[in-house]
Amino acid sequence: MTGFYFAAESSWSPYVILVLALAAMVANRLVRPKRPNDGLNHIPMLEFEDGDNSTERYIRDTWALLHAGYLKYTKRGMPFQMRNPADPDHPQVVLPAKYLSELKSAPESRFSFRLYSEQAFLLNYSHAPKQTDRTTHMVRTEMNKNMGALLEATQEEIEVALASKLPNSTAWEPATPYMALAYTTSRAIARVLGGRELSGSEEWIGMNVGVTGMTHQAAQQIREQYPPHLRWMARWRHPGARAVIATRRRSAQIVDPIIQKRLAGAQDTKPGEPDGIQWMLAAQGSRRPSAQEVADEQLFVGIASVHTTSATSLSILYDLLDRPNVAEEIIGEINAVAARHRDVGGRWTKQALSELEKLDSFMAESFRFNPVGLVTMQRSAVVDYVFQDGLRLPKHTQILFPTCEFNRDGDVHPNPDVFDPWRFLKMRKAGDPNKHHFAYVSDQMVGFGGGTHACPGRYFASYEIKLILIHMLTRYDIKWPDGLTRPPNMVHDFSNVPNFTATVLFRNKSKS
């Protein structure tokens, strides 16, 4: 890691860089590898029928093309190719649902999300923190194992954060909730991963909120400004990549004193309150992780969770505001469950949260109706692969499944274009009560992925979103300004997020 930073900060002679660049260009011309899509001629390529296949068109109208491809190919069990405007060097293949079972159990050595991330977001050039086995273990095992103990701390952070960012008046006041939600989710995950010391650092919270946009912007600019054979130069020369390095370095400086306190046996957390830094220190045994390693783990989890959780929370809130009668019914459920659990000091437990069946069903239906991502289970083929039915995919092919189309397929969900707030509650009552909840994954609900590679943090996200909504619905009257309803989502490539700039009216209930 030290060598990494020395290299990042070195000041090479322009002449040396020029010579190396020319050498790379010559080598690229002489030994040009076979393009990945050369081995995909057996899979149809879908384009816009009107002939406008510009990059801007693909980014703007992705859902329309996915829908056309779903009706023509994937619903009939056939894959198709789409142009990959974000990563032209790697073709993307949209797969039908029949391949879900094989992909769900495929090892990382065959189909890799990490490789997909490196290709799609240029992680090797932007210096963005990467997923590691430690990160996955920390979230999938330690966080889920300690969920009960983490909820009290999470609720405390949510209450403090929302109270500081939302209006606190007896009169109706306008606000744009998104940044309050991003700040809140960042504080909550910081408390879980680093205790009070980390969640109390405003610099860290701001860094954790901003690093996602920083890394994505760096990757986009590098892709636009550097051809593939010259991208190695961007690691040292591109301002965005250098800004990511500076952020990572500063994050290590913030984390290091916390680590030293833990090693000295002192910490500013309640007895019995576990957190990610403790888990990392315990997991390393005799090998002590560096502050940079710990900070990178923390930043990666923030990149993976802060904005997705915030956008999902905002989307559910918008859907509730469009259905005030349903919202009142859910508030009634919240109050009834809270009354049954008054003996826990006003704090929500796992058991109490699990009894909020109407809220959970509404969240699941909102997640189906307005998914924040149009696709799921993105992977890159690590090796040439042949599926059981004979479908061949060459190495480095990117694959994905069209979540948005599964969600709106009448053969999967009856009356798919109707928002039914109790859809999933009725499914639980009619079948297995342990299925069909918000964090549940199946071949019909793949928003969180599937199988052994399903999102490991989905259970925490479910509890966190519930705690956020409980606080907002019970502490505030909330409504749209007169005459307004949920604005259209912002669709960009495979992203389908709620409008972050919409104004909502808040009034503090406790003071009104």
UniProtKB/Swiss-Prot annotation:
Metabolic or biological pathway:
Secondary metabolite biosynthesis
PROSITE patterns named in the record: CYTOCHROME_P450, F_ACTIN_CAPPING_BETA
**Any Gene Ontology CC annotation:** membrane
**Which UniProt keyword terms apply here?**
Glycoprotein, Iron, Membrane, Metal-binding, Monooxygenase, Oxidoreductase, Transmembrane, Transmembrane helix
Triggers of expression: Expression is positively regulated by the cluster-specific transcription factor cheR that binds directly to an asymmetric direct repeat present in the promoter.
Q: InterPro entries from the xrefs?
A: Cyt_P450, Cyt_P450_CS, Cyt_P450_E_grp-IV, Cyt_P450_sf, F-actin_capping_bsu_CS
Transmembrane region(s): 5-27
Instruction: Name any Gene Ontology BP term.
Output: secondary metabolic process
Q: Which GO terms describe its molecular function?
A: actin binding; heme binding; iron ion binding; monooxygenase activity; oxidoreductase activity, acting on paired donors, with incorporation or reduction of molecular oxygen
Q: What is its EC number?
A: 1.-.-.-
What's one Pfam family the UniProt record gives for this protein?
p450
Known glycosylation sites: N53, N124, N168, N499, N508
Give the phenotype of cells or organisms lacking this gene: Impairs the production of chaetoglobosin A but leads to the accumulation of cytoglobosin D and chaetoglobosin J.
Taxonomic superkingdom? Eukaryota
Identify its protein family: Belongs to the cytochrome P450 family.
Query: What's this protein's name?
Result: Cytochrome P450 monooxygenase cheE
Lineage of this protein's species?
Eukaryota, Fungi, Dikarya, Ascomycota, Pezizomycotina
